[in-house]
Amino acid sequence: MGDSKNILIKGIRIYDCAGMGAHFSSSENIALDGFKVKPRKGLWMSLTADATHFNSCRGSIEIINSEFEGMCDDATNIHGMYWQIENIKDKTLEMSYAKYRNQRISISSAPKAGDTLELPCPENYMRPTHFAKVESVSVSPDKKRIIVKTCDELPQWLAKDMAVSVKEYRPKVRIENCRVGYVRPRGFLIQTTGAVVKNCSFKDTVAMAILIEADLNTWGESAASDDILITDCVFENINSSKRNGEVAVFASAKFKKGLPFEGNIHGKIAVKNCLFKNCGKDPVRLEYTSNP
């Protein structure tokens, strides 16, 4: 579902599907209530990809009273997209996807007039320190780049290959009373500002249960996260692959080789009143975070 607004999906169960269960892009205000992804009795797999995926959405995302089981990919992935600077001239930025995609860029996936670009600093190409309001956006004739004219003067330190994110692609997130079990990789991937994960249970995941990761290297998924609360959750038999150690909740970042990454990226991330069973000695690791 793309370019949509005020979406409610309630009381739906998906037994099996070759692909994702529910995919949303460039959409606003999405609620899932009683959304279940579970295989039929006697089968071990439900989906070959994510149960839910939210790309460059805004407004709010709410997932409550839902179950995710047997996927070959994540229960949910909430993220924006990094744009990589190609050229700079006065108040205009020419940018491409930070991760190459063999597809044409559509105007619907680009930032909109009135949005705010998050611009990095010289010491860390992924930490936003400067902001510029978008005046206009167009797509290049070859559909491989966007041309963004800003209302504000751009800082002198901006350079080619720096990562740019969009402030509005940080929806407020509430995930409550949900269950994740028997998943090949992870549970929840969350990249946003303002998220609460409450009263959820995670069991038998191959990788970490919750991942908060700005990723400029592999997928180009943004961005730096802040004001994240994980509370009253239960984690059991998490990260059997021992990825990054036996960690259940992991905040980190992936930089492109050779680019500067001094200091932190993420803001406040808190894990409170959670129970960890068979999750390793140190089940919570918060890297590149202002309050580890």
Language-model features: where?
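Short glycine/acidic-rich loop motifs that flank beta-strands on beta-rich extracellular proteins
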Residues: A18-F24, R40-D50, G59, C72-I78, ...
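Catalytic cores of secreted or luminal carbohydrate-active enzymes
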Residues: E67-I85
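Surface-exposed loop/turn motifs in large extracellular/passenger domains
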Residues: M1-L8, E28-F35, H53-I64, Q103-R104, ...
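Conserved, compact domain cores that house catalytic/ligand-binding motifs in diverse enzymes
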Residues: G2-N6, K10-G11, Y15-M20, E28-N29, ...
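Short alpha-helix capping/helix-loop boundary micro-motifs
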Residues: L93-I107
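Ser/Thr/Gly-rich low-complexity blocks that favor extended beta-strand/coil architectures
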Residues: I105-D142
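Small/polar beta-strand repeat architecture
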Residues: P128-N177, G181-Y182, L189
